[in-house]
Amino acid sequence: MQVSVESTSALERRLTIGVPAERIETEVNKRLQQTARRAKIPGFRPGKVPMSVIRQRYEESARQEALGELIQASFYEAVVEQKLKPAGAPSVEPKVFEKGKDLEYVATFEVYPEFEITGLESIAVERLQAEVAESDVDNMLEILRKQNTHYKQVEREARDGDQLNIDFVGKVDGEAFAGGSAKGTLLVLGSGRMIEGFEAGLVGAKAGEERVLSLTFPADYQNLDLAGKAAEFAVTVNSVSEAELPELNADFFSLFGINESSLEAFRAEVGKNMERELRQAIKSKVKTQVMDGLLAANPVEVPKALIENEVNRLRVQAVQQFGGNIKPEQLPADLFQDQAKRRVTLGLIVAEMVKQFDLKPDESKVKTLIEEIASAYQEPEQVVAWYYGNEQQLSEVRSVVLEEQVVDTVLQKANVTDKAVSYEEAVKPAEAPQAA
């Protein structure tokens, strides 16, 4: 077999491969002999059909099948011989495809980039330091109570925080507009659900009262037909209800799957969950900075085929997440291009880190992570057993741990500074990472 390789760009390779005619004929004859043993042709006993008849009927299909398989096999042999790592399926262009002659074709494809990780010392990481204080637990208890607020109907003027049952009709230039009317809508004053001035305009209203609100839609309103326009809303208040926060008792605790009657035990459980959330938030922010630093320090040219594959995966995920009747291929690729490039680039960099620093999953860390995941469930022992009994899930945990070990390896060499912050600041979502 003859092979020549040409680099047409940093990652694109062009292989010209020649397969001897003798090898082709051997494969064709092998298929014809297999066909002869099972062919059923009128006038001949099974297995006794003359080869000339078999060849006349089946040679063309046998040749096409043989050529297809030989192209696959010879391409694989060629990339192994040339020590190439294809990053996607090749584009095959036949040059000589005639009976009796050597098969010659050109395969064009991309290869994985070859690079070494550098610049770890230049990566700057700010590692947050925080604790869960008693005041943080107090705040969390209030948040949980507000999330489970009940409303009790009252006979008085409406105040901020009250829930109103209202009917309203909105008009622009004297005409009702789509989506501008509703009946029996529940609205909490001060929630910011409606455009500016709507909720404030109902403060002081009583059940049975009607008010007309003259308002203006924001210039950046999502409905461009209404953006910046003046509108009038005729509002009827059906009822006014005030918020009632639930008591911190056993009934309230049971809403969160905690079968405790004492406030101290509930606070301890909430505090434990907050500690877990804090650790995860700090770890996530450190990881994001490390990955951003690796990207900045190691610019890598990424095969287009890998990005296209990742775009397709993200399309499928989007359809599964948001549903609807849309097909993945109908979603514009541009929507996912930056995210796909970042994910693929980081995947290549992380894989190179694992290889370069000879990293392997630390089984003690795998066990710790599984136990931490399991601690969020009511039957943690069963969750741990499930992970260790499910090879696919266990493999995914090992991948997460390996990625954490990559982060730890970078932190050993990076410029790390610690910063003391409050619990709230530590768990506050970070800004979305920039694309590579």
From Swiss-Prot:
The gene is tig. The keyword Transferase does not apply. Involved in protein export. Acts as a chaperone by maintaining the newly synthesized protein in an open conformation. Functions as a peptidyl-prolyl cis-trans isomerase. One of its GO terms (biological process) is 'de novo' cotranslational protein folding. Residues 161-246 form the PPIase FKBP-type domain. InterPro entries: PPIase_dom_sf (IPR046357), PPIase_FKBP_dom (IPR001179), Trig_fac (IPR005215), Trigger_fac_C (IPR008880), Trigger_fac_C_sf (IPR037041), Trigger_fac_ribosome-bd_bac (IPR008881), Trigger_fac_ribosome-bd_sf (IPR036611), Trigger_fact/SurA_dom_sf (IPR027304). It comes from Azotobacter vinelandii (strain DJ / ATCC BAA-1303). Belongs to the FKBP-type PPIase family. Tig subfamily. Keywords: Cell cycle, Cell division, Chaperone, Cytoplasm, Isomerase, Rotamase. Consists of 3 domains; the N-terminus binds the ribosome, the middle domain has PPIase activity, while the C-terminus has intrinsic chaperone activity on its own. The keyword Cytoplasm applies. This is Trigger factor. GO terms for cellular component: cytoplasm. One of its GO terms (molecular function) is ribosome binding. It is found in: Cytoplasm. It catalyses: [protein]-peptidylproline (omega=180) = [protein]-peptidylproline (omega=0). NCBIfam families: tig. Its EC number is 5.2.1.8. Its main location: cytoplasm. It is an enzyme of class 5 (isomerase).
